[in-house]
Amino acid sequence: MQNDQQRFSLQNRTVLAHPYKRLGGAFTVKSPSVPNFHDKMHSDHSSSDSALVNGSFRANDHRSVEPSCLGQASPSEHDGNLSVIDLYGDEVESQRAEGEDDDDNNGDNGNEDLEEVHSDDLDLVPDDDNRQRVELEGAASATSANSNGINNTHFDRYGFKKQNNYISEAEYDKWWVEYSQYCVRRKHKWQLLLEKSGLPVTDDSPSRFPSKSERLKRYVRKGIPAEWRGNAWWHFARGQEKLNKNKGVYSQLLRKMKQIKKQNPNEKQVQDLDIIERDLNRTFPDNIHFQSSLHNKEGPPIIKSLRRVLVAFSLYNPKIGYCQSMNFLAGLLLLFLDEERAFWMLVIITSRYLPGVHNINLEGVNIDQGVLMLCVKEYIPEVWSYIKPSIDHHQKNNKTFSPSNKKVLFNMQKNEFLYRLPPITLCTASWFMSCFVGVVPIETTLRIWDCLFYEESHFLFKVSLAVLKLSEHDLSKIKPRNNSLNYSWGSNLNQRGGSMGQEDSDMEIFQVIQTFPKTLLNPNEIFEKIIFKRRFNLNRLDQDEIDRCRKFVAAQRLKFKTYGELLGNSTSEADLPINDNTDNKGIHITSDAVNEALSSEVYGFKKSLAGVHWNNSIKEKVKQMRKKKDKGD
């Protein structure tokens, strides 16, 4: 066979493919963007585990999978032990129409209205000498998978089902035809970027990436090649730095797990072990790699790894232990990283990117929801107008304040939504706890993770605002009930009627916010319509702003809780009776004291003044101005 050609069989068809030149007819190839699965699990694994893991190859591995390694499966069963290469039929049409323009405006971005166009970032069609060598892989492994009862056409390149309640398989396939070509072009640009940076790609698995820059951020936002994601996430999150400081820790945790099991096999020694076991089979049940076989009661290798990672984390950080949603974080990490690195990435996510979010009291997630509501109010007031009526309604019907305390009531209501969170946060809280896993389709989730690890946690707030902004059209379709979206407190609506009307509206808003993100199949929709648009103020949001805002919200919530307890109502945060001369257990607090405490802080977002980030107190700023004036005199 000639060196410049490859021959492979596609369902009894023999195809000759030139690696450089465009073919005259359509041909089927594997997408070059398949996850770079690890070659092995942790070194402490049993030999049986290792044998099963041999089915997980790298994207450029041409070895076939022996049926004996895969086990026997019934025609209706999906074997979770197969690798991604073996399972998917994410086959793409590599041929494009002659003369098709392939730059950012018509290719990557697909939107001529984009405000950021960079000449060094255009997806130009490479000539024969510089053309990306698209790896043409045979369908032998796919045929082997089919013989074991797996229909590849129903699953995406990560092993997830294409179809769900909001997206049909036909819609997915239609989108994938174009998006797969986008992935090919973006990977080629990444390769050129690394080569220009003196970081040549070897074995299609780069472990080093360029220093942070605006250009690299743009590349990350347009998507990291899927088979590079594990290494890229690890690099940007400084995972190796964390591992170097904790060498041998994960192995020690695994040995501790074994010792506990040997000493007390029937006694629960590990925190939340029962909950972890229960959630293992609830983790990505529709994903091929997580599905159990009738002949393997212990579950597929990735489930065993997931168990070890979650139990090890519970031992490593007993203050958090195990929190539901962590199984999805660890599960997705295991699709792209080996077991030990997945463990440390979970540690990094819970400590650096989402501090306190997974703590037992979940105060961290409440703080972040307060921050998100502040951001919605500031950056997308048009969406805030749908949330505010619920807050106003609650304040209007709150009978715990006496008429003599109107000033106290007014000052508390200014920041009330920070500690009495709006109903919508029951939905958006899961966005943060799971980092959008299960909230948006998998390709969009992975794009968000790319940006999260590169840009830090503020991107979660930014993309949340973008999703809410995109949902505005659906929110506008909600019909006001009893004038609930535009409350007029001078109306003659009775309390019950107004309450029911607002509750109905809250429910409809909740449904929109819960279901709309699940339709965002194309991640570029978020980026092209919102993130890359300079005219949206939400794109000014940065990590410094989020860090400051978190401190502000945490202080406000703590202050409210403290005064609630002092006033003898610590059992119910929702009702805080404040009356003049309240005497509780010898503590004498006047409404003026409460008013001073709860109204002293006001948050201000960065505007055009770079030196003014936020205001702790209007009075404090006045004092500072007076001091400066006195010094000047």
Curated annotation (Swiss-Prot):
- Gene3D superfamilies from the entry? putative rabgap domain of human tbc1 domain family member 14 like domains, Ypt/Rab-GAP domain of gyp1p, domain 3
Q: Does the keyword Cytoplasm apply?
A: yes
- For bias type Basic and acidic residues, the affected ranges are 37-47
Q: Which residues carry this modification: Phosphoserine?
A: 147, 484
Q: Where is the Rab-GAP TBC domain?
A: 223-456
Q: Which Pfam families match?
A: RabGAP-TBC
Q: Does the keyword Cytoplasm apply?
A: yes
Cellular component terms (Gene Ontology): cell periphery; cellular bud neck; cellular bud tip; cytoplasm; cytosol; fungal-type vacuole membrane; incipient cellular bud site; late endosome
Please list where the region (Disordered) is annotated: 26-127
Q: Where is the composition biased (Acidic residues)?
A: 99-115
SUPFAM superfamilies the record matches: Ypt/Rab-GAP domain of gyp1p
Q: State what changing residue 282 to F/K does.
A: Reduced GAP activity
SMART domains named among the record's database cross-references: TBC
Q: Where in the cell is it found?
A: Cytoplasm; Bud; Bud neck
* Keyword set, alphabetical order: Cytoplasm, GTPase activation, Phosphoprotein
What InterPro entries does this protein map onto?
Rab-GAP-TBC_dom, Rab-GAP_TBC_sf, Rab_GAP_TBC_domain
Principal location? cytoplasm
Biological process terms from the Gene Ontology for this record are: endocytosis; establishment of cell polarity; establishment or maintenance of actin cytoskeleton polarity; exocytosis; formin-nucleated actin cable assembly; regulation of protein localization; vesicle targeting
Which molecular-function annotations from GO does this UniProt entry contain?
A: GTPase activator activity
Reported function: Regulates exocytosis by functioning as a GAP for SEC4. Stimulates specifically the GTPase activity of YPT6. Also required for efficient polarization of the actin patches.
Q: In the UniProt entry for this protein, what further remark is given in the free-text comments?
A: Present with 178 molecules/cell in log phase SD medium.
Q: What name is this protein filed under?
A: GTPase-activating protein GYP3
Q: Which organism is it from?
A: Saccharomyces cerevisiae (strain ATCC 204508 / S288c)
